[in-house]
């Protein structure tokens, strides 16, 4: 994965590209900068709302921060997006995450 600074150069070159924001979210999460990571994932979703894996990442971060209700809502939104775009792998992974999170309540 490129460094945060390299990803930010890509975002500066094309701020409308949702993948750059998603990559930034992944890197920030790796660096344990969870709030900033969520912001980057949301920026990615503002550019393309049909990204189930951005929702997956947000749900996982929220769950790790103890925000179960919000995590479940994010996972359900991702599942809805995965289903509507016909992505069976993302649907399966998000469905499993919803079940896991609901079981943790």
Predicted regions and their residues:
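Canonical positions in the second alpha-helix
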Residues: 9-10, 43-44, 78
